[in-house]
């Protein structure tokens, strides 16, 4: 009977050790799982941050490209305005010259008609 009690006690101790071992292994597994989740989360955050920076960079590049295009359009507009102003001034000068010539011709005719030389 003492043998049976000893075996029962040994079995209980053995079961308790196995239970503690299983609990320790389970805790270790949970810790590994948590560490893996933390690592995955960290990796995800790093990737997300990288993608956001790339997006901002791309938006800045697009903005710079659009800005450059707008500057080119503005420069073309300025050139066109200068061309128009130049053409206008040339025509205005031609009109002034024509009026001067006409005035001079009228004066000459009046001189001739009045007998002034």
Curated annotation (Swiss-Prot):
Top-level division of the source organism's lineage: Bacteria
Key words of the record: Ion transport, Sodium, Sodium transport, Transport
Ranges of biased composition (kind: Basic and acidic residues): 7-20
GO terms of biological process kind: sodium ion transport
Region (Disordered): 1-20
Keyword Cell membrane belongs to the record: no
Functional description taken from the UniProt entry: Involved in ATP-driven sodium extrusion.
Family listed: Belongs to the V-ATPase G subunit family.
Protein name listed in UniProt: V-type sodium ATPase subunit F
Organism: Enterococcus hirae (strain ATCC 9790 / DSM 20160 / JCM 8729 / LMG 6399 / NBRC 3181 / NCIMB 6459 / NCDO 1258 / NCTC 12367 / WDCM 00089 / R)
Gene it is expressed from: ntpF
